[in-house]
């Protein structure tokens, strides 16, 4: 075997050498005999672990490139990895689809559930609104019934009081008549009078009348619950996103949403009511206003024995029934209000008549040529509200217990001379303790028929008529006209239009004072026995005198001329060149005194966004302490400033800081648009009327020489209506650096962006003092004549 292998090896070598050395080797090579193909070379296992293989060429295939089995293994491994990933993604996709389907189903179920809940809630809201409105209506009916019963109780109190007065007067009249008989009656009738029992009854009745029967202010007006649909449920920034939302989410917009608002009439709250939109529809609305700390009362019912209102332009003495503005009436008592009373209407009030505690005469024990008669009539006014000043047609009252009295004395001296030249001289003098006017001289004339006459006494007691006829037949008819005349205090409070009338001044600090009204008549007769026969043909010469005070021009004149003028209070004035007498509040304590209050804001209870006519006539009310909100009236401002005046503006912020500004001041006539003329500023608040706002520009914000503007009569320099935007009548330019008639915002600083619909600084502002976005707590405007006038 070994030899065979050696032989094969030798043959192979020989064959190779022979082939190389042959001459035909070119033909062999040309036929491809010398070409070698690639040889498969198995690499070591360690060489296949390399991962960075370059591109393989034919020359590099054997010693660098991996084998096909290795490549297939790598390909299979990568394919398996990708397959696993794809399967994992498919499983996740299936899970997400299943979860999405479940979530959609759950969302639809939730939306259906919420839709049902919203529908039920909407029904509940509607039911709640109806029930609350029905409850409010029933409470309102109950409140009106309570007020009606209170008025009936007051009427009964008035009747009881009048009956007590009549009983006491009857007792006094009987006693007077018995004592006037001078012997004959005293022998026939032995009688004693006890007035202490009546005084005790009077005190008890006064205590009963003093009790407050009407609801308090916080219970006087029930808040109203208003429900309205929300217009924009989805904010504008989310509306675009809602378009891309699923249909079930869009169903939320179809659900109706309601807004509930609690409105309190006459208060700043859920609905303030003094915005331009609200006030224009109710520019003459009635608001219950009174000073802080005062007891609440019905706006048109001052309460039992209340002193009532002073209405500029009204005159008349106490008339039976209702007392209407601008009407006059005869003596009487009864309801006193702006309209006829009706159950629950809160207008009208049965007020007890002013007491007149009787009439008596005193005669001496011996006869004399001259006879003296005294008529004593005392008038006591017990009120549940101090003296008040009412401007315009507002129905406002302020309470506080006070008793005021008025004392007047009328003396008549009658002299009759001898029989041959008999004549009668009558001298009449009317005086009062406080120097006030006592009214017309004819009010207490002897020719009036008095309620305490003998005729009336005989009518009340017919069983004693024979006694009076027998014993008093010879008495002069003049002696029969005893009694008293009921004189209601309403003629004092409403007769301010007549120049002859005078409103007595009461000290605002006094709470109780004693009063009596005396009428003294003296007759001197020369021949009493034959007076009836000779009196028919006598010639009568009557001289009647009456002392009348000159009407005061303003508060400074009140300070100089009236005894009670040094105290703050309400007084009656008559400006020069005017035939109108009206009532004003005088401040006699500030600076030199003599200040006349023309405007005041203190609690935001009164709406100042009024019409031109309202600002012309004035509106609002004040009590005798100067508490309340009001505007005196542009007509009165023009009359009071014709001769030049000083304007004082007093400001107070919510921290208690005070400031003032004073100007030379004049207001033009209505034909001039009530143009404002101001100059000569001095003070601590800053010059807002002449200089205006420096930042906004004086030419745009100065109020000097500007006409008065209201929302229904635009006279400003702006292309729009400043009064409508800023919420009150004022002397606007384009538009303001001060506005004391703006909207009252409690708390001071306010955000104008919340002031719908104008989003502007429309508060009670004085820009140099606290800025345009700060609404002041209290402001007052006062005037007085220039020094030297």
Swiss-Prot record:
Region (Disordered): 263-420, 526-555
Keyword Transcription regulation among UniProt keywords: no
UniProt feature, compositional bias: Basic and acidic residues: 263-287, 384-396, 526-541
Signal peptide annotation: 1-19
Taxonomy, superkingdom: Eukaryota
Coiled coil: 69-554
Sites where a glycan is attached: 609
Positions bearing Phosphoserine: 46, 447
InterPro entries given in the database record: FIB_ANG-like (IPR037579), Fibrinogen-like_C (IPR036056), Fibrinogen_a/b/g_C_1 (IPR014716), Fibrinogen_a/b/g_C_dom (IPR002181), Fibrinogen_a/b/g_coil_dom (IPR012290), Fibrinogen_aC (IPR021996), Fibrinogen_CS (IPR020837)
Ranges of compositional bias, category Polar residues: 397-416
Disulfide bonds: 408-438, 722-735
GO cellular component, one term: synapse
PROSITE patterns: FIBRINOGEN_C_1 (PS00514), FIBRINOGEN_C_2 (PS51406)
Modification note: Conversion of fibrinogen to fibrin is triggered by thrombin, which cleaves fibrinopeptides A and B from alpha and beta chains, and thus exposes the N-terminal polymerization sites responsible for the formation of the soft clot. The soft clot is converted into the hard clot by factor XIIIA which catalyzes the epsilon-(gamma-glutamyl)lysine cross-linking between gamma chains (stronger) and between alpha chains (weaker) of different monomers. Forms F13A-mediated cross-links between a glutamine and the epsilon-amino group of a lysine residue, forming fibronectin-fibrinogen heteropolymers.
Locations listed in the record: Secreted
Function text: Cleaved by the protease thrombin to yield monomers which, together with fibrinogen beta (FGB) and fibrinogen gamma (FGG), polymerize to form an insoluble fibrin matrix. Fibrin has a major function in hemostasis as one of the primary components of blood clots. In addition, functions during the early stages of wound repair to stabilize the lesion and guide cell migration during re-epithelialization. Was originally thought to be essential for platelet aggregation, based on in vitro studies using anticoagulated blood.
Classification via PANTHER family: FIBRINOGEN ALPHA CHAIN (PTHR47221:SF3)
NCBIfam families on file: GGGWT_bact
Free-text note on domains in this protein's UniProt record: A long coiled coil structure formed by 3 polypeptide chains connects the central nodule to the C-terminal domains (distal nodules). The long C-terminal ends of the alpha chains fold back, contributing a fourth strand to the coiled coil structure.
Protein known as: Fibrinogen alpha chain
Organism expressing this protein natively: Mus musculus
């Amino acid at each position: 075997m070994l030899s065979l292998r050696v032989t094969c090896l030798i043959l192979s070598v020989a064959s190779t050498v022979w082939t190389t050395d042959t001459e035909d080797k070119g033909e062999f090579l040309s036929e491809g005999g010398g070409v070698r193909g690639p040889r498969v070379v198995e690499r070591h296992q360690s060489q296949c672990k390399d991962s960075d293989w370059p591109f393989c060429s034919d020359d590099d295939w054997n010693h660098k490139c991996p084998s096909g089995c290795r490549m297939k293994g790598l390909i299979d491994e990568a394919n398996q990895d990708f397959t696993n990933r794809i399967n994992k993604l498919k499983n996740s996709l299936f899970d997400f689809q299943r979860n999405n389907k479940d979530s959609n189903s759950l969302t639809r179920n939730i939306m259906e559930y919420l839709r049902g809940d919203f529908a039920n809630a909407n029904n509940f809201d509607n039911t709640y609104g109806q029930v609350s409105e029905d409850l409010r209506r029933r409470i309102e009916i109950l409140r009106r019934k309570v007020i009606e019963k209170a008025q009936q109780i007051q009427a009964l109190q008035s009747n009881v009081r009048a009956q007590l007065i009549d009983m006491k007067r009857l007792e006094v009249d009987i006693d007077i008549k018995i004592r006037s008989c001078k012997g004959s009656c005293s022998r026939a009738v032995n009688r004693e009078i006890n007035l202490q029992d009546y005084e005790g009854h009077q005190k008890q009745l006064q205590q009963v009348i003093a009790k407050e029967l009407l609801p308090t202010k916080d219970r006087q007006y029930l808040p109203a619950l208003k429900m309205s649909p929300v217009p924009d449920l989805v904010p504008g920034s989310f509306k675009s996103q809602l378009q891309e939302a699923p249909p079930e989410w869009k169903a939320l917009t179809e659900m109706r949403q309601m807004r509930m608002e609690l409105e309190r009439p006459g208060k700043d709250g859920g609905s303030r009511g003094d915005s331009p939109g609200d006030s224009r529809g109710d520019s003459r609305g009635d608001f219950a206003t009174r000073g802080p700390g005062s007891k609440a009362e019905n706006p048109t019912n001052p309460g039992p024995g209340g002193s009532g209102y002073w209405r500029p332009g009204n005159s008349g003495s106490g008339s039976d029934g209702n007392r209407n503005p601008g009407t006059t009436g005869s003596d009487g008592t009864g309801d006193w209000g702006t309209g006829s009373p009706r159950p629950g209407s809160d207008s009208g009030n049965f007020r007890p008549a002013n007491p007149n505690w009787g009439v008596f005469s005193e005669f001496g024990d011996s006869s004399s040529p001259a006879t003296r008669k005294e008529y004593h009539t005392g008038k006591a006014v017990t009120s549940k509200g101090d003296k008040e000043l009412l401007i315009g047609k507002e129905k406002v009252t302020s309470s506080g217990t006070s008793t005021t009295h008025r004392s007047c004395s009328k003396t008549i001296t009658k002299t009759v001379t001898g029989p041959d030249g008999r004549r009668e001289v009558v001298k009449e003098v009317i005086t009062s303790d406080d120097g006030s006017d006592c009214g017309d001289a004819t009010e207490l004339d002897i020719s009036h028929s008095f309620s305490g006459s003998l005729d009336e006494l005989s009518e009340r007691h017919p069983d004693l008529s024979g006694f009076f006829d027998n014993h008093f037949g010879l008495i002069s008819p003049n002696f029969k006209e005893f009694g008293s005349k009921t004189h209601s205090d309403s003629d004092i409070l409403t007769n301010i239009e007549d120049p002859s009338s005078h409103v007595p001044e009461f000290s605002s600090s006094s709470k109780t004072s004693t009063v009596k009204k005396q009428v003294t008549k003296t007759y001197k007769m020369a021949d009493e026995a034959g007076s009836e026969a000779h009196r028919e043909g006598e010639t009568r010469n009557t001289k009647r005198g009456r002392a009348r005070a000159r009407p005061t021009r303003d508060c400074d004149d009140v300070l100089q001329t009236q005894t009670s003028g040094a105290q703050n209070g309400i007084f009656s004035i008559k400006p020069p060149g005017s035939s109108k007498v009206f009532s004003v509040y005088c401040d006699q304590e500030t600076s030199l005194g003599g200040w006349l209050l023309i405007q005041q804001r203190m609690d935001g209870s009164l709406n100042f966004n009024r019409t031109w006519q309202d600002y012309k006539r004035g509106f609002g009310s004040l009590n005798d302490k100067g508490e309340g909100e009001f505007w005196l009236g542009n007509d009165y401002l023009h009359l009071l400033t014709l001769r030049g005046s000083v304007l004082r503006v007093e400001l107070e912020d919510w921290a208690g800081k005070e400031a003032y500004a004073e100007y030379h001041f004049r207001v033009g006539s209505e034909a001039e648009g009530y143009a404002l003329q101001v100059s000569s500023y001095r003070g601590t608040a800053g010059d807002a009327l002449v200089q205006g706002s420096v930042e906004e520009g004086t030419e745009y914000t100065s109020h000097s020489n500007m006409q008065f503007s209201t929302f229904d009569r635009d006279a400003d320099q702006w292309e729009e209506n400043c009064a409508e935007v800023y919420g009150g009548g004022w002397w606007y330019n384009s538009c303001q650096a001060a506005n004391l008639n703006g909207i009252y915002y409690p708390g001071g600083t306010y955000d104008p962006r919340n002031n719908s619909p104008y989003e502007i600084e429309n508060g009670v502002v004085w820009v140099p003092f606290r800025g345009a976005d700060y609404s002041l707590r209290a402001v007052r405007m006062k005037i007085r004549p220039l020094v030297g006038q």
